[in-house]
From Swiss-Prot:
The lineage of its organism: Bacteria, Pseudomonadati, Pseudomonadota, Gammaproteobacteria, Moraxellales. The keyword Nucleus does not apply. Pfam families: MutS_I, MutS_II, MutS_III, MutS_IV, MutS_V. GO terms for biological process: mismatch repair. The keyword Heme does not apply. Belongs to the DNA mismatch repair MutS family. GO terms for molecular function: ATP binding; ATP-dependent DNA damage sensor activity; damaged DNA binding; mismatched DNA binding. This protein is involved in the repair of mismatches in DNA. It is possible that it carries out the mismatch recognition step. This protein has a weak ATPase activity. Transmembrane segments: none annotated. This is DNA mismatch repair protein MutS. PROSITE patterns: DNA_MISMATCH_REPAIR_2.
């Protein structure tokens, strides 16, 4: 049963259900949490969906068209856990609260006060400490695209606009880490949604075209920032960025049901400001999330930030390494100064005492702050002088401009701290409605109301004594209940002695209850004092929030400074703890790492980690790495990328020394897996990733390629791997680490720009000892059977494999004696002049081969991935014919 189907005729429903259906009509896209007393209830299709997603009981309430109305509900006091699960599942939830007073005349007034979506969360109960809630909007027009990002929980707002290249979209979105993406429902290409969902696990929300209106965007943003022009933000020539930003403002106001006073500025970014990392590279390097459930990511390893906002800033820093070496050196100077004077420890001790004020300030701005939020803010203000004292030796030395600047941005909030100390009790309740939040002595009117409320007991005792003396009835009692209010109780036998001013209120089996004008006056005063005191507390609390909102810009600056100091101190702590070194930057192309280590593997390994050197430059762009499985090839490649990444995040690095030139992108082609969702085989996935690298890598890119070509036949795979090495070296000219089991590739080591390396291993008494040391030169053998033995392959299988290996090696030797070695790899294009000759080599085929004829007919640039795979099968069939 669908609520929309029964909206046509509301007359057959109860007043409560009529009210529900009218509200639901405006929120068809959301699960409506409808407040009913101490529960949130859901009806019709919402009830079915909630019962399924939350595992709660599906029941019914009333009927519609003769059928029971499905109903499910959750307790109000524990709703946050259920809300978190629904939002995590990508659902939108509308919270409908009781806002009116119970009058007995029809249902109490209700309205939607907040809409929860994955990209608009600010409540700690709905977010983990290190999780950002990033709302991202896209605006595409012709060959341009505008991005905008809004993190309501942190007050972060930024935009960029650039040429639209579909293949670049996943890279930019992965850097922004969206929790929810907004798109124009009228203009977007369906393929874009498909591409987003392929690479990112976040909902895509279609919004009305008017939200993205280019003409209205300027006014929307000017109104938000209270300015007459956006030229100061650098947005004038960027209409699509402005349109995307305006769409975010519309959506945020709609979901929060309030203004956004903490969104006071906007930052313009350029994609060229950052090192590009596509989703595959982020996953392979395990930057934020580990590849496997019980693994450890780089973020998990290095995150020992003392504040939640510092942890979130660290996560953003790792996801978007910057290319501005002046900014990086400023960070490194700050780290160096903290390390040299052992200053990071006292700084971190103070930071540990500071709560998540970044999110507190967002809730203050949105009007959803709770009493304990202000206690957190009060305590943070109290810690600022201690934090500045801990930084003082470094600031006074004037060797770190960044720390000096951050020290100033911390500000002085002594007066605010004193104000909050006077206003809020030491340990307030969770909710304002529970009362006793405002401290005694802060407000005279509130103190008077509390006096009446709190001293009611003594008044009643005194009145009871007085009435006993007046009536001479020693058993007279004064009491109270919620139904009757205050009363004087006499037994039936004594009721005849009741004075004339006793007004009968209630008759019981054995007693009569009365009220007097004096008791009635007291009752009115006491009962109203409770509600009036709570109303006064609410007004005072709202006034506090308004006062804080007026100072929100300075408070946000303080919060941002704390987060930055926390990240810098954390990097200093990691450097000291793990013996990391300060990296150097050079304008010359290259990567030179001495004694490099993989930070995660080193930290988790029980055995000492074997450090290795990396050397790549314009004369040595390609390193072909051979050697046994488990020998450390993948670890070596990943550590090179992670060291480069950490350096460009402004951190010290796990190495004895590191010197890095410009890097615009990091690519990885590591590991193998089928993509069952799209029907792609392991080899097809491998080739798709390889194609991305060949098309988009530049001479400033760092490329890691592991076992290219292993997903197909030996000769096909070898030929492809060979061609990739040649293309990356001669045309792309990137810096590349290329691990392979194709020993034939080591022949390329004699070509300019290509060097051979191998991971060392030794055999001792038939056992393989992996030394994990990378040395120059090709590997002498693969040690495949020894690795299989280490993996626990049964002895009889190893023995059979050894027999087969000897047979194959003998056959290969016989073949080599009867063939011309120089014909194995023929130059692909004999017409190229020697100075520019490409050294791609493939298995030689006869000139009249059907396969060669078919190959000549293929238009490579126009092939889709599926067509490419079909052509491969046709080529193989032609070769076999």
């Amino acid at each position: 049963m669908n609520s929309a189907e029964i909206m046509a005729d509301l007359s057959n429903h109860t007043p409560m259900m009529q009210q529900y259906l009218k509200v639901k009509k405006d929120y068809q896209h959301a699960l409506l949490f409808y407040r009913m007393g101490d529960f949130y209830e859901l009806f019709f299709e919402d009830a079915h969906l909630a019962a399924k997603l939350l595992g709660i009981t599906l029941t019914h309430r009333g009927k519609a068209n003769g059928n029971p109305i499905p109903m499910a509900g959750v307790p109000y006091h524990s709703a946050e856990g259920y809300l978190a699960r629904l939002v995590k599942a990508g659902r939108t939830v509308a919270i409908c609260e009781q806002v009116g007073e119970v009058t007995g005349k029809g249902p109490v007034e209700r309205k939607v006060v907040r809409i929860l979506t994955p990209g608009t969360l600010t409540d700690d109960a709905l977010l983990t400490s290190y999780q950002s809630s990033n709302l991202v909007a896209l605006c595409i027009h012709q060959n341009q695209i505008g991005f905008a990002l809004l993190d309501l929980s942190a007050g972060i707002f930024k935009v960029q606009q650039q040429d639209y290249k579909p293949e670049q979209l996943p890279i930019e979105l992965a850097r922004l880490m969206p929790s929810e993406i907004l798109i124009d429902e009228d203009l977007v290409d369906p393929n874009i949604i498909e591409q987003i969902k392929k690479h990112l696990d976040c909902p895509v929300t279609k919004r009305p075209n008017v939200d993205f209106n280019l003409n209205n965007a300027q006014k929307t943003l000017c109104d938000q920032f209270s300015v007459s022009t956006l030229s100061g933000f650098g947005l004038d020539p960027l209409p699509l960025a402005k349109a995307a930003a305006a769409a975010l403002i519309h959506y945020a106001k709609e979901t929060q049901k309030t203004a956004l006073p903490h969104i006071r500025s906007i930052l313009l970014e350029q994609s060229s400001d950052f090192i590009a990392l596509d989703p595959i590279t982020r996953r392979n390097l395990e930057i934020i999330e580990p590849l496997f459930e019980h693994g450890t990511s780089l973020f998990q390893l290095v995150n020992d930030c003392q504040t939640a906002m510092g942890g979130r800033l660290l996560s953003r820093t790792l996801m978007q390494p910057v290319r501005d070496t002046a900014l990086l050196d400023a960070r490194l100077d700050a780290i160096e100064q903290l390390i040299q004077g052992y200053h990071e420890s006292p700084v971190r001790l103070v930071l540990k005492e500071i709560g998540d004020i970044e999110r507190v300030l967002s809730r203050v701005a949105l009007g959803s702050a709770r009493p304990r939020d202000l206690v957190q803010l009060r305590h943070a203000c109290a810690q600022i002088p201690f934090l500045r004292n801990a930084l003082a030796p470094v600031v006074q030395a004037k060797k770190s401009k960044l720390l000096g600047q951050l020290d100033q941005e911390l500000g002085d909030f002594k007066s605010l701290h004193q104000h909050l100390m006077a206003a809020i009790v030491e340990n307030p309740p969770v909710l304002l409605r529970d009362g006793n939040v405002i401290a005694e002595g802060y407000d005279a009117e509130l103190d008077e109301l509390r006096q009446i409320r709190d001293h009611a007991g003594q008044f009643l005792i005194d009145l009871e004594i007085k009435e006993r003396e007046r009536t001479g009835i020693s058993t007279l009692k004064i009491g109270y209940n919620r139904v009757s209010g205050y009363y004087i109780e006499l037994t039936r036998a004594q009721a005849e002695q009741a004075p004339a001013d006793y007004i009968r209120r209630q008759t019981l089996k054995n007693a009569e209850r009365y009220i007097t004008p004096e008791l009635k006056s007291f009752e009115d005063k006491v009962l109203s004092s409770e509600s009036r005191a709570l109303a006064r507390e609410k007004a005072l609390f709202e006034a506090l929030l308004e006062n804080l909102r007026e100072n929100i810009a300075h408070l946000q600056m303080m919060s941002s400074a704390i987060a930055q100091i926390d990240v810098i101190a954390n990097f200093a702590h990691q450097a000291r703890l793990n013996n990391w070194a300060r990296p150097e930057f050079t304008p010359e192309t290259g990567i030179k790492i001495q004694g490099g280590r993989h930070p995660v593997v080193e930290a988790l390994s029980k055995a000492p980690f074997t450090p290795n050197d990396t050397f790549l430059d314009v004369q040595h762009r390609m390193a072909i790495i051979t050697g046994p499985n488990m020998g450390g090839k993948s670890t070596f490649m990943r550590q090179t990328a992670l060291i480069s990444l950490l350096a460009y995040c402004g951190s010290y690095v796990p190495a004895r020394a590191a010197k890095l030139g410009p890097i615009d992108r990091i690519f990885t082609r590591i590991g193998s897996a089928d993509d069952l969702s799209t029907g792609k085989s392991t080899f097809m996935v491998e080739m798709t990733e390889t194609s991305q690298i060949l098309h988009h890598a530049t001479n400033q890119s760092l490329v890691l390629m592991d076992e290219v070509g292993r997903g197909t036949s030996t000769y096909d795979g070898l030929s492809l791997a060979w061609a990739c090495v040649v293309d990356l070296t001669k045309r792309v000219k990137c810096l590349c680490l290329f691990a392979t089991h194709y020993f034939e590739l080591t022949e390329l080591g004699s070509e300019p720009g290509i060097d051979n390396y191998h991971v060392t291993a030794q055999e001792l008494n038939g056992n393989l000892i992996l030394l994990h040391k990378v040395q120059q030169g090709p590997a002498s053998q693969s040690h495949g059977l020894q690795v299989a033995k280490l993996a626990g392959i049964p002895a009889n299988v190893i023995k059979e494999a050894q027999k087969r290996l000897r047979i194959l090696e003998k056959q290969q030797q016989q073949h080599l004696q009867t063939s011309v070695q120089s014909d194995l790899f023929a130059t692909l294009d004999s017409e190229v002049t020697p100075s520019t000759q490409v050294i791609e080599k493939v298995i030689e085929v006869e000139v009249s081969s059907p396969a060669l004829d078919l190959l000549k007919q293929i238009e490579v640039d126009n092939l889709t991935p599926r067509q490419a795979l079909e052509q491969l099968y046709e080529l193989k069939a032609a070769l076999n014919s």
